[in-house]
Design a protein with these regions (language model features):
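C-terminal motif of bacterial Sec signal peptides marking the signal peptidase cleavage site
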Residues: 17-21
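Flexible loop/hinge segments at secondary-structure junctions
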Residues: 23-362
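Bacterial N-terminal signal peptides that target proteins for export
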Residues: 1-10
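Terminal targeting/leader modules
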Residues: 10-12, 16
């Protein structure tokens, strides 16, 4: 997939607008607030709420854009801090924010214990990114098993026979591979390690999956932002980020072999192909992971972002304001999602979410 200039401009503008709308820095964007759940405010109605959220950096570019547009439409703001899924889960459990965001779904038991509700917000993809001079995006091919061996430290150089065999005609350097991973609790890490656990028995037994894992080797960066920064700085490095960060930073991403055996590149189309098999209707509390999904064109590390809210907050109006923002986003934010290479939720799933709000977030 080649990035069109319009798409990159939209991505850059989304982040800039999200930050300026709230006066925040790179890690914290104030985003427009919300208005109702039990009785959501009408779209376009002027409100004055200011709501706080924190969590996944995966969804930060999209929430920033939604927030700026919602602010322009309603005058409301939300302050969303890009601190990682682990931090978002911790803050919503503590009640220090109005919503948390995580790319790892919580189980029904975890939600019940913490008094939380959970619903999807958008779908995107985790992509391996590399710093190899002269390499174009999508030209380097990595199977899941090979990617696991690289992050296990078994494949140590770019001219290793396993990489060369998978990439005939690609000019590869002789140097050492430097691994870059997340240093914070991360839903991006969860989806990356969950996928590797599905395709590599050795990875599953030695490292496993989680928002934080014991990495065999490498350099840790905070947030998608931190990983992207390190990969850009370190020649011969490889890391993993949400696609928007790869595009924003002009970093070459790899092609990958999916469960159907086909080589695919990351895009909204290949993310949608992976999401097509998702059975949300059978997923209690939307607890569903869609890595390594079937589908001829499915991207293998496709991920869902989830929003978390307290069922019984101290101030019920805060929930109403927060849900009004998400209702607006679902009704008016599809174009923004497409521009930033996310996949907006299908209409049937949005109906399911709104029914869930009515019963679980009164």
């Amino acid at each position: 997939m080649k990035l069109h200039s319009a798409g990159l401009a939209a991505l850059s503008l989304a982040i800039a607008l999200g930050l300026s709308a709230c006066g925040g820095d790179k890690q914290a964007a104030q985003q427009p607030a919300a208005a109702g759940a039990a009785a959501p405010a009408a779209a376009g109605a002027k409100v004055t709420a200011e709501v706080s959220g924190a969590g996944a950096s995966f969804i930060f570019p999209l929430v920033s854009k939604w927030s700026a547009d919602y602010n322009a439409s309603t005058g409301a703001k939300i302050n969303y801090q890009s601190i990682g899924s682990g931090g978002g889960i911790a803050q919503i459990k503590a009640g220090t924010v109005d919503f948390g965001s995580s790319d790892k779904p919580l189980s029904s038991e975890e939600l019940a214990q913490a008094g939380l509700a959970q619903f999807p917000s958008a779908i995107g993809g985790v992509v391996p990114v590399v710093n190899i001079e002269g390499l174009e995006a999508g030209k380097l091919r990595l199977s899941g098993a090979l990617l696991a061996d690289i992050f296990l430290g078994k494949v140590k150089t770019w001219n290793d026979p396993a990489i060369v065999a998978a990439n005939p005609g690609v000019k590869l350097p002789e140097g050492k591979i430097t691994l870059v991973h997340r240093s914070d609790g991360s839903g991006t890490t969860f989806n990356f390690s969950n996928y590797l656990s599905k395709v590599s028995p050795e990875w599953k037994s030695k490292v496993g999956e989680g928002t934080s894992v014991q990495w065999p080797d490498g350099v840790g960066g905070k947030g998608n932002e931190g990983v992207a920064s390190y990969v850009k700085q370190i020649k011969g490095s490889i890391g993993y980020v949400e696609l928007a960060y790869a595009l924003q930073n002009g970093m070459p991403y790899t092609a990958m072999q999916n469960a159907a055996g086909n080589w695919v590149e990351p895009s909204a189309e290949t993310f949608a192909a992976a999401a097509a098999s998702a059975d949300w209707a059978s997923a209690k509390d939307f607890n569903l992971v869609i890595t390594n999904a079937p589908g001829e064109q499915a991207w293998p590390i496709t991920a869902t972002n989830f929003m978390l809210m307290q069922k019984q907050p101290k101030d019920a109006k805060r929930n109403q304001d927060t849900l009004a923002f998400f209702k607006w986003a679902f009704e008016n934010g599809q174009a923004q999602a497409n521009e930033l290479h996310y996949v907006p939720l299908p209409a049937e799933l949005v109906k399911q979410i709104e029914a869930y709000w009515a019963t679980d977030l009164k």
